[in-house]
From Swiss-Prot:
It is found in: Mitochondrion inner membrane. The gene is ND1. It is a multi-pass membrane protein. It catalyses: a ubiquinone + NADH + 5 H(+)(in) = a ubiquinol + NAD(+) + 4 H(+)(out). The chain crosses the membrane at residues 5-25, 40-60, 79-99, 105-125, 151-171, 177-197, 237-257, 263-283. Its main location: mitochondrion. It comes from Triticum aestivum (Wheat). This is NADH-ubiquinone oxidoreductase chain 1. Keywords: Electron transport, Membrane, Mitochondrion, Mitochondrion inner membrane, NAD, Respiratory chain, Translocase, Transmembrane, Transmembrane helix, Transport, Ubiquinone. Belongs to the complex I subunit 1 family. PANTHER family: NADH DEHYDROGENASE SUBUNIT 1, NADH-UBIQUINONE OXIDOREDUCTASE CHAIN 1.
Length: 325
């Protein structure tokens, strides 16, 4: 187990925050390309300084609290959401040994942290004392709980193949073949469940602008709004990293060639994460928002039985051919 020091934590958090900032810019650029627009291109060359301008604007805005809100909880909710999105990265390996804390229960740790994220949203909706914010928070809670069950069953499928909750061991078990190839339907279900877990389009019902104005963060401004925003995009990167570790071999090269081995393993990991982030943005640009009943029906009537049914054949094949680790 590696003991984290402040310098290592700083080297993890700063690139993550920069990645979140430029992920917002990349999303706006890709959305503009799909809609045949230019996107932001005024602030800096090709709009590269747009995230800095947006951040300064949010910092300089006045933080306004509703008169009927619970002030302490109203202020703490975005901080809790943002902090949970950061502490989850403690167990994510970027290369073999390049991890803050190589826990044997790293996968369970990530699952638990992602489950706790809903509390910040619930507290934000309740403490705002606004009907629209509270309805958005209730939607988010129901949505995340519904899809966490299928995510848990998918994780069990991977655990049967590996026999360990250590993320580094899960990656090293994919040296011969990535789990995304034999378990491709599971990968698709897991990615769609991650879309719902992070409240991203087409499952962004908790913040439906047409119905709930902006959802649980309708009363937030200034840094409160910015922290929710940063937390959402940090969770996007986290879930993309988890998809990479579980199904695309993590930091392992795409092809076992001499030239591919010269590229640092952390670069391979970043390339695969960027692939999933592009899918996040492309799905938002291509698909309309689901109705609430369609969203819950997909999670409970389709993904839950399918993910449960997938555990049975994987277990049977592993026991029959003595492939259990």
């Amino acid at each position: 187990m590696y003991i984290a020091v402040p310098a290592e934590i700083l080297c993890l958090i700063l690139p993550l925050l920069l990645g979140v900032a430029f992920l917002v810019l990349a999303e706006r650029k890709v959305m503009a390309f799909v809609q045949r627009r230019k996107g932001p291109d005024v602030v800096g060359s090709f709009g590269l300084l747009q995230p800095l301008a947006d951040g300064l604007k949010l910092i300089l805005k006045e933080p306004i609290s509703p008169s009927s809100a619970n002030f302490f909880l109203f202020r703490m909710a975005p901080v809790a959401t943002f902090m949970l999105s950061l502490v989850a990265w403690a167990v994510v390996p970027f290369d073999y040994g390049m991890v803050l804390s190589d826990l044997n229960i790293g996968l369970l740790y990530l699952f638990a942290i992602s489950s706790l994220g809903v509390y910040g949203i619930i507290i934000a909706g309740w403490s705002s004392n606004s009907k629209y914010a509270f309805l958005g928070a209730l939607r988010s809670a129901a949505q995340m709980v519904s899809y966490e069950v299928s995510i848990g069953l998918i994780l069990i499928t991977v655990l049967i193949c590996v026999g360990s909750c250590n993320l580094s061991e899960i990656v090293m078990a994919q040296k011969q073949i990535w789990f995304g190839i034999p378990l491709f339907p599971v990968l698709v279900m897991f990615f769609i469940s991650c879309l719902a877990e992070t409240n991203r389009a087409p499952f962004d019902l908790p913040e439906a602008e047409a119905e709930l104005v902006a959802g649980y963060n309708v009363e937030y401004s200034s840094m409160g709004f910015a922290l929710f925003f940063l937390g959402e995009y940090a969770n996007m990167i986290l879930m993309s990293g988890l998809c990479t570790l579980l199904f695309l071999g993590g930091w392992l090269p795409i092809l076992d060639l001499p030239i591919s081995k010269k590229i640092p393993c952390s670069i391979w990991f970043s390339i695969k994460v960027l692939l999933f982030l592009f899918l996040y943005i492309w799905v938002r640009a291509a698909f309309p928002r689901y109705r609430y009943d369609q969203l819950m029906g997909l999670g409970r009537k389709v993904f839950l039985p399918l993910s449960l049914a997938r555990v049975v054949p994987v277990s049977g094949v592993s026991v029959t051919f003595r492939w259990l680790p």
